[in-house]
Amino acid sequence: MGLEKSLILFPLFFLLLGWVQPSLGRESAAQKFQRQHMDPDGSSINSPTYCNQMMKRRDMTNGSCKPVNTFVHEPLADVQAVCSQENVTCKNRKSNCYKSSSALHITDCHLKGNSKYPNCDYKTTQYQKHIIVACEGNPYVPVHFDATV
């Protein structure tokens, strides 16, 4: 009886392992948002090469140059709190976007027109603007940077 059980459980174990294992190394949407958009310290934001450095450091120039990106220089908790602020319609017409109640310190990175991969060259511009983020999950956290206003 014990051998029969193990003959059934052994393949089930590997089936389950094959199902769970691929997600172990995968970045969640919330983690991707943090990697691509959060820089609370903003240590080198005054440098004209800030975007070039950060886009490379945060893996947004692998294989191609990401055309536009925004970094937020506020504590993560403050950005996560946006998910409980004013509900607005997202650019894609979904209803899970939220607008910050106050202007936040941000840096916009725009790929320069003559720039080509692998030499991604970005224009760095600092602003204080309201941000709009899409939120999902439990806990309800930012998973997509939608816009600034």
Swiss-Prot record:
Annotated CDD domains: RNase_A_canonical
SUPFAM superfamilies with a match to the protein in the record: RNase A-like
Active site: H37 (proton acceptor), H144 (proton donor)
Signal sequence extent: 1-25
EC number assigned by the record: 4.6.1.18
GO molecular function: lyase activity; nucleic acid binding; ribonuclease A activity
One annotated Gene Ontology cellular component of this protein: extracellular region
Localisation per UniProt entry: Secreted
Disulfide bonds: C51-C109, C65-C120, C83-C135, C90-C97
Class in the EC hierarchy, top level: lyase
Domain of life: Eukaryota
Chief localization: secreted
Stretches that traverse the bilayer: none
Keyword Ribosomal protein: no
One Pfam entry name: RnaseA
Tissue: Pancreas.
This protein's UniProt keywords: Disulfide bond, Endonuclease, Hydrolase, Lyase, Nuclease, Secreted, Signal
Function: Endonuclease that catalyzes the cleavage of RNA on the 3' side of pyrimidine nucleotides. Acts on single-stranded and double-stranded RNA.
The protein's assembly and partners: Monomer. Interacts with and forms tight 1:1 complexes with RNH1. Dimerization of two such complexes may occur. Interaction with RNH1 inhibits this protein.
Protein name: Ribonuclease pancreatic
Species this protein is from: Mus musculus
